[in-house]
């Protein structure tokens, strides 16, 4: 298949178009990334050769590798181990106030917020830390809040196969706080539901109530 053809997202939530671009052009090197930072410094009006900026390209490339580590991680690996001995527990499991940092795909500035994630188990559960790790995987990519909300829910539903999933995200977008309209403290809330959580209004109310406690 021609590498220029853009395919649909794979099951990890990572666009296959990224793989196509890599096949076509080759993955940029560390040196390429550092050179790009130097170009941005020059474009901004500063001198990348001055003492305070000499190591900045290397530091920025290293920081971006950490900030966007979600592109190299898979929710399948995180959610692959489940526990079936749950003592008959089959009610809502909620992990709330999961703090995260992401980056807006439009301006590449921070999105800072917290996620509340719940699911109705179908005779099996995962370790609570795994839910937080799934949030981190999708947060450490260029995102919109709507996308990260849907990706978290879809991955848990698809891999764990619970009876239903609920996700709420509350976040402040620096693209609104630092630039443009410059409204600090404005919060965006997104929610999504799957399975029984999608069709049962009482379960939705229970989820929303528990997140506010």
Curated annotation (Swiss-Prot):
The keyword Metal-binding applies. GO terms for biological process: one-carbon metabolic process; tetrahydrobiopterin biosynthetic process; tetrahydrofolate biosynthetic process. Keywords: GTP-binding, Hydrolase, Metal-binding, Nucleotide-binding, One-carbon metabolism, Zinc. Pathway: Cofactor biosynthesis; 7,8-dihydroneopterin triphosphate biosynthesis; 7,8-dihydroneopterin triphosphate from GTP: step 1/1. GO terms for cellular component: cytoplasm. It comes from the Bacteria. It catalyses: GTP + H2O = 7,8-dihydroneopterin 3'-triphosphate + formate + H(+). Its EC number is 3.5.4.16. SUPFAM superfamilies: Tetrahydrobiopterin biosynthesis enzymes-like. Zn(2+) binds at residues 104, 107, 175. One of its GO terms (molecular function) is GTP binding. Toroid-shaped homodecamer, composed of two pentamers of five dimers. Belongs to the GTP cyclohydrolase I family. This is GTP cyclohydrolase 1.
